Amino acid sequence: MSDIQDKQYHDYEIEDIQYPEGSVVLIFDLDTVIYPTASKQDKTSIVVKGRTEDRSYKNRTEFKKVCKENDWNYDIFTIEDTVNAAPVHICYAVFKKTIEKYIKELGATHCEYYLGGSNNFRDTLPLPVQYKSNRKKTRRPTHLKALQLYALKTYSAKKICGMECDDFVSIRMLEVNKQKNVKAILITTDKDSLQSFTSEGYVYKQGVLYHLNSTLGELHIEGKGTKTSVKGSGLKWLITQALIVGDSTDEYLPRKHFKTSYGEKSWYKDVKDIEDVPTFLKFSIDKFIELVGTSTTYTDYTGKEQNLTWLELAEIYWSCAYMKTKVNDTTTFEDLLKQHNVEYKV
């Protein structure tokens, strides 16, 4: 069993399976299925100590409300987190049902299953804060490892190393989709999945099947009232993440280097109507230089001082956001600029 759990694969070690014409192949990013499945089987609450008897509450927010209503001093209480997990077999059953639901909804004839492994290249990028370091303190669902092992054993899932799972499933979806009369669909909830711009692809995300067939892509506003955010697809979405918005969940934020305030809504207004790739890329680098200067200095998470040109800084954040599109993909931001004949100075 430990051999199954410990075995990991680089992108170039995965067999390029050739499917019969007419096949519909689902490429699963199981990290986005397993984690929420395991998490939902944990019922969390708090136990409050400090008065005559211990009492349970759903969460700290609920208890703070009780304190306010009773004029209690919240800070004098001792609070303990508690977790009650459902039996692990329920996790297995929910996971199996979820997979079957995808297969039925999309009429799949074949499936490939992948999990994230170790040695993610982004972990060593010289960012001000280490990539995804905030997740080290996050409590993992009780049955997470058990469900991962179940997927590896029962579904012959493969664990990917050297990159993130969402990189590899993007590669596989695009590669399989190139096969004659074969439709490959990426199954994920990851927001990065819609940034593909190199070839045609399909992504099934939160009940919606996206057909990606535009290099430039688009941007739009999601949400209502004050709770709105910019979303999109293609290059517009990728560059929005890489050079402007970043990702607070993954701990990379280009705005930490901005010399002036500039937000995603301003960016959206500036680029939403641009209709060709070279013009969009030229505007992007001009705006980035305006925001960070021609060079920048900062201390990375290891304590080392970084003195970088705007392009070197852009390359770091490009590496954070860019999802690989082919095996042994070494595409840089500069490669993209040269490909589209965009002029720039360093």
Describe the function of each predicted region:
Residues 2-15, 78, 108, 133-345:
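Extended two-metal-dependent nuclease catalytic cores across DNA- and RNA-processing enzymes
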Residues 3-12, 16-182, 198-211:
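Noncatalytic, basic helical substrate-engagement surface that gates or grips nucleic-acid strands
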